[in-house]
Amino acid sequence: MASDAVKYMPIHGGGTTATTAADIKSFFSALKPKKTSTFAYAFVITFVSFTLFFAFSPSPNSSSPWFSNIFTSSSTTTTSDNTSGSQFSSIFSYILPNVTSTKPTNRSSDATDSLSVNATSPPLNSNSKNGTLQTPAPETHTPVAKNTTFESPIVNGTNPDAKNNTSSHPLLSDKSSTTGSNNQSRTTADTETVNRNQTTSPAPSKAPVSVDLKTNSSSNSSTASSTPKKQTKTVDLVSSVKQEIEKWSESLKNCEFFDGEWIKDDSYPLYKPGSCNLIDEQFNCITNGRPDKDFQKLKWKPKKCSLPRLNGAILLEMLRGRRLVFVGDSLNRNMWESLVCILKGSVKDETKVYEARGRHHFRGEAEYSFVFQDYNCTVEFFVSPFLVQEWEIVDKKGTKKETLRLDLVGKSSEQYKGADVIVFNTGHWWTHEKTSKGEDYYQEGSNVYHELAVLEAFRKALTTWGRWVEKNVNPAKSLVFFRGYSASHFSGGQWNSGGACDSETEPIKNDTYLTPYPSKMKVLEKVLRGMKTPVTYLNITRLTDYRKDGHPSVYRKQSLSEKEKKSPLLYQDCSHWCLPGVPDSWNEILYAELIVKLNQLSQTQRKT
């Protein structure tokens, strides 16, 4: 339009009124034929110009209220979505402070993480580096399947039976945020609350609140001065967790934890013999008079990596506000006591580590719990040697008879189904005479099998356990582990027939002398592969088979009965393990698994 005006202006400007009037008349005459199109053209240019001006110059003031509101609303909506859609823990708020918490994208095919950010994570790739269990070959000796630490796949990335699947995960959701910075100085009332709730599953927590160290100050002036110290301590602990993960994650992610050897390390054991008064007498070999001590200085060394030394302070920080539960037989009690001693030795004030109430029975099944007060966490053990219920019926003669209900899980299962980390095991009690024979002992419903092979009974029991896990344990909130069979080393008999191991002071060094891989563990592996809920298999069978030197043998107690004094060598324990000892290494593997999973989650967050 400007060019048209210039085009029809008089040369040299003109000067008379008549000329000007004529020019104006001429100008409008020229526009008249194109009046409609010219007006539309001018309107479009004007609208676009104003639109661009407001779009690229947003302002909160009244000069651009419409676009200002659009930008502000968009930002607010994004923040809200992220907050409601991501429930990450304080640990990861600290570890990844600059990562925006959003719903994760699908992981790469080689990820092996049961700590996926939500329940719709992709299924585990069968060829993943550290998460696949290959079918054990029919070998004479214990096979070491590549990457035997595996998680069973989740069909289509989801578990249809899991309840309340959310993006919250164990070790991820901020359970400690409800107590804020006061976790380090819990009141007596808080402690009593912990004690009262040890045998009840924790109520579903609300959406976690991220802990912001910059604003985590008390409004009370009397406590404000102590806040910087608490914050500094928390930052130091979380920084240590981050450093531990960064230090070990790369070497551990492709490592086959269970293929390796025992090597001597003079820096072991992880706690001084006799320093932990929590150890049962039957595991306290040095106190019971065992003279040799080299068995305590051995650590498990995988071929392709080194396991991190278990740092109790860091593990406690990972477990802050959480429950770690062991469920199974006395071998899992062995592992539980080992971990409690390691963690207890890492706290500054051991008076703040205590047993919740001693041995507690729930419907006939024993439960033990230790409270770590400064961390508001518990490490518990539930006695369930078969993982299914021991039963009692009355026969036609009115005589009470013991049976094993293959179709019912242990009675205490309701008490631990909501725990954050659960470590199951079973195996040794299936070798006893009654279970081995299987005559009039195994029961399903009202039917008592006159005869049932022990392997079939074992399969039925584990299938019942697996179905219970899929129905009751939410993989979005709980990590599930299953520890494999722990080898026994009776020579010249069994546990009740004069079997011995008291002369063993060194581990087996030649694989030829290892025992065949237990058939029951092959059954277990098949059940785990068929499960939808991720279960990490701690296949410690082979690594324990080397350790014929690690059992209590005759050093299982100090005061012998008169009968035992006459033939002390006839009463030996070659099933359980001295503490400190082999179970410490099981816990180091568990610790390494947690580091791997936390690192995988952090990588997933970074990608989003």
Curated annotation (Swiss-Prot):
Q: How does it sit in the membrane?
A: Single-pass type II membrane protein
| Motif extent (DCXHWCLPGXXDXWN motif) | 573-587
Q: Name one GO biological process term.
A: cellulose biosynthetic process
> In which domain of life is the source organism classified?
Eukaryota
Compositional bias segments (type: Polar residues): 101-137, 145-203
Q: Where is it mainly found?
A: membrane
Q: Where in the cell is it found?
A: Membrane
What name has this protein been given in UniProt? Protein trichome birefringence
